[in-house]
Regions:
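Short, solvent-exposed loop/turn elements at domain surfaces
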Residues: 57-58, 130, 186-191, 246
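Acidic, polar ligand-binding/catalytic clefts
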Residues: 26-42, 52, 93-117, 124-125, ...
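Transmembrane alpha-helices and adjacent helix-loop boundaries
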Residues: 273-516
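Extended ligand-binding regions for polar small-molecule ligands
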Residues: 25-26, 53, 60, 95-97, ...
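Pocket-lining segment of extracytoplasmic ligand-binding domains
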Residues: 30-103, 127-128, 278
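Bacterial N-terminal signal peptides that target proteins for export
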Residues: 1-10
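C-terminal motif of bacterial Sec signal peptides marking the signal peptidase cleavage site
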Residues: 20-23
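Extracytoplasmic small-molecule ligand-binding "clamshell" domains
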Residues: 31, 44-51, 61-80, 173-241, ...
Length: 516
């Protein structure tokens, strides 16, 4: 059977296996009673906490014997508690009510004498202080004219907003402003019909329009947003940011726009659906059809392939150029290139690509806000891919017998012509298989670019997951799409390899241009 015919069977088999295990998933208690009726039931429970959130300290203080598990976003917590991975977690009541509106199987118990203040975060410098003063004045105006009350009813009320937030045209505004948004923080800010929406998002749009700012938005978790704020990459952080004395030492906070009670969220087994398959159609529609989310997925695929293709091209040029310089006739040039190549290859081999990515984003290009996240991702992966090309070009060219070069010289070829006409074509048959594997690895590795606010395929899947609070379809569809992309790329390279194999080429093709 040909490999191409096995693809549908593999996809079908994968879907059946994953669907079966997902359908068999059940909630499990980790020290808490099956039915939670009071806060006392959480004393020996497994509790979820968002890394760096204020609830870390509160959870430890209220439940010292509980086991804590740390997650990236509140959306992760809502999903994990429904799947039984944790028994509960702390959240603000506004966030809980917004998630509950979409039909999540959750219940909540209010934590006595505990509330949180939510505001906007700005840089701890003169510009940040000026922005804070403007935002405070703007919020005071919105409170006095009743706009805040109207927005509270709109975004915090019992009805789920369905209308896309109208975004003003900021293109003519003179002053740029870089904004980090954690879009997993419904109802403060989240994605609705492919655009940012929510209480904070609407106020932010009005603020930029009133003060003449031209915003650029970057979707990142709040912890990454705070890091970018400290490095100067962002001017504002938005996403249900809690105001605390500790954070105020490094962040200018606006006056709180929301005061919310804190609740302990747990899974409500009585409201749980009968089975996975009973909600299969509904979950499919929420993931792909509702709000045209399939369009977001297509854009994510395009971004992933753009980064992969550009990194492959620029990385190949970088690695090949460095290899040519290392073989230069002038010893000073070749020695320098070899030394650079050795250090370069060692740095890439010993440093995780995600660290390189974040260094470029938060340190090297922190002050260059006009350099987009996608460009930075291409630079990082080109840097990494170039190291592979440099190392493997040496191995591949070294596999060609030196007698081939001597024969070319005997025929009157120059050193350059002998390399490009005789040696390199033979080296390609050794180079291409590993090159193909590295390109496939490159495509999969780009899944981390969401760390620097690039809306690639994985990031889009996370955004959809944070809106639907369903993990199955966003994650499985992302995995299948990566599988298809890498399979297609590998198939194309296999075709190219077959065309370059001497045994498969006719005599006329091999001797083309040779006088007989």
């Amino acid at each position: 059977m040909k490999p191409i015919k096995t693809l549908p069977l593999l996809l079908l088999l994968l879907g059946i296996i994953v669907g079966t295990f997902a359908g068999c998933a059940t909630s499990a208690s980790h020290g808490a009673p099956d039915s939670i009726t009071s806060l006392e039931d959480f004393k020996n429970a497994k509790l979820g906490v968002v890394t760096g959130s204020v609830y870390d300290g509160h959870s430890k203080a209220l439940f010292p014997n509980a086991k804590l598990a740390y997650y990236q976003t509140f959306a992760d917590l809502f999903q994990c508690v429904q799947q039984g991975k944790i028994d509960g977690f702390m959240a603000d009541e506004a966030n809980f009510n917004a998630v509950k509106r979409v039909g999540a199987d959750l219940s909540a118990l209010k934590v006595p004498d505990l509330c949180v203040e939510v505001g906007y975060g700005f840089q701890k410098n003169a510009r940040g202080e000026a922005l804070k003063a403007e935002m405070d004045a703007f919020l005071a105006t919105l409170r006095s004219d009743g706009t805040v009350d109207r927005l509270i009813e709109k975004w915090y009320g019992s009805a789920e907003p369905t209308q896309t937030l109208e975004k003003p045209d900021f293109s003519d505004n003179p002053t740029p402003i870089s904004i980090a948004i954690d879009s997993s923080r419904k109802p403060f800010v989240y994605m609705l019909n492919g655009s940012y929406a929510g209480f904070e998002a609407e106020i932010l749009y009005m603020f930029c329009e009133a003060y003449g700012y031209r915003p650029s938005f970057s979707g990142v978790p709040f912890a990454s947003g705070l890091a970018g704020l400290a490095s100067g990459r962002f001017d504002v952080v938005v996403g249900g940011l809690y105001v605390t004395d500790e954070r105020a030492q490094s962040v200018h906070f606006s006056e709180p726009h929301t005061y919310a009670d804190v609740v302990m969220v747990s899974h409500n087994a009585e409201e749980a659906s009968a089975s996975f398959f009973a909600n299969f159609k509904e979950n499919f529609e929420k993931t792909f059809i509702l709000e045209g989310r399939w369009k977001q997925i297509c854009k994510g695929i395009g971004t992933t392939m753009l980064i992969s293709a550009a990194s492959m091209v620029f990385g190949s040029l970088l690695g090949f150029l460095l290899y040519l310089l290392s073989k230069n006739s002038y010893k000073c040039i070749s020695s320098t290139a070899k030394a650079i190549g050795k250090v370069y290859a060692r740095i890439v081999a010993g440093t995780p690509i995600v660290v390189i990515l974040m260094i470029l984003f938060y340190v090297v290009f922190a002050k260059y806000k006009n350099v987009g996240s996608t460009v930075i991702a291409i630079v990082a992966f080109s840097f990494s891919f170039g190291s592979f090309v440099y190392r493997h070009m040496g191995v591949s060219v070294g596999s060609v017998e030196f007698g081939q070069t001597e024969a070319a010289y005997a025929l009157g070829y120059s050193k350059t012509k002998a390399f490009f006409k005789i040696v390199l074509p033979q080296a390609m048959t050794v180079f291409l298989p590993s090159f193909c594997s590295e390109v496939v690895s490159l495509i999969k590795a780009t899944a981390i670019v969401g760390y620097i606010a690039v809306s690639d395929l994985t990031k889009v899947g996370d955004i959809i997951r944070s809106n639907t609070f369903e993990a199955f379809f966003p994650l499985i569809s992302t995995a299948l799409i990566y599988f298809l992309l890498t399979w297609i790329v590998a198939s194309l390279f296999n075709i190219l390899k077959r065309k370059l194999e001497p045994k498969r080429r006719s005599e006329d093709v091999i001797l083309k241009g040779v006088e007989r």
